[in-house]
Every structure is written in structure tokens, then in C-alpha cells.
Amino acid sequence: MMSKLGVLLTICLLLFPLSVLPLDGDQPADQPAERMQDISAEQNPWFDPVKRCCNWPRCNVYLCGPCC
């Protein structure tokens, strides 16, 4: 019984190797550095264009930009 399972597993791995599965690192949306480059501070709704900074309650350097 165990040898039959071994043969079946070997055949399955030969027909469908694990290397064809997509890895998580291959997805560009999964890389935080690239996600942060897609959003500029000026497009953020919390960004004050007159002061050119973010309002204090919503201020976060990683999300919006410089704080007021």
C-alpha cells in the first residue's frame, strides 16, 4: 500500500512540479515599497495642499507625508 502511494506521489510531482506554482514574492502588490510609490502625498485626502502637509490627527509619515 505504501509503495503505491509513493509511486502515485512521484507521478504527481513529475506531472505537476512545485516550481510552476506562483510565489508570493512574484506579485508586485505584495511588496510594500512598490505600493508606497504608487500613492503620492498630494493624492492623499488628508493632505492639506495650502500648507503642503498632513493634518495632525491623520498624520503618518508612511501614509501621507510631512506633518503640520
Swiss-Prot record:
One of its GO terms (cellular component) is extracellular region. Keywords: Cleavage on pair of basic residues, Disulfide bond, Secreted, Signal, Toxin. Residues 23-52 form a propeptide. Residues 1-22 form the signal peptide. It is found in: Secreted. Expressed by the venom duct. It comes from the Eukaryota. Disulfide bonds join C53-C68, C54-C64, C59-C67. The cysteine framework is III (CC-C-C-CC). Classified in the M-2 branch, since 2 residues stand between the fourth and the fifth cysteine residues. Belongs to the conotoxin M superfamily. This is Conotoxin reg3.14.
